[in-house]
């Protein structure tokens, strides 16, 4: 789906005003830094010297396993499959899942997996897309209620603060805190209730089929493509879709 398009299966006309917006986080508002930079950071904290070539090789190997930001599906092994299934519902499972994934990196040095997980959760690892802050501020200035709805297993609020967008959301709903993860209907309904709108009056903005499950509740949904950190992802289209709230 292009950023200019939305799907509306609510049974209502698409002219029905959108009065609140739900945003996914990773892949929608921000992306992790280039993987080679994270690998170099991990090497530094582990006291390992890597040349540019080896850093690139390790980054490519980890990306091929489906590390965050790679755009590749995760290659989940039986040794951490249970943790992977629960990664968005438990901090412990989230850590176990991603450390397990990184542990399979060919040529990794001692301490690599733990260091990569530490870097993943660090606020400075995350880079907002070029249109994230302008879009959120424009919606906020127009009085549009906003909620962050994220499948995640660690507290992303310090990341939001680092990106200077923490004060732009009325509610921050994290799957591991509420006990529901997208595509479960409950997490979308929870967001709508908190924002004080009916599902048919809301827009979900995300980058995955889990986000698109909001359509089943009558929430119009905008999906954006995989985009490199710092580039324009296309969420600025939201400002053209949302009606000004009634006075």
Report residues per predicted region:
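N-terminal helical cap/lid subdomain that shapes the substrate entry/recognition surface
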Residues: 15-130, 142
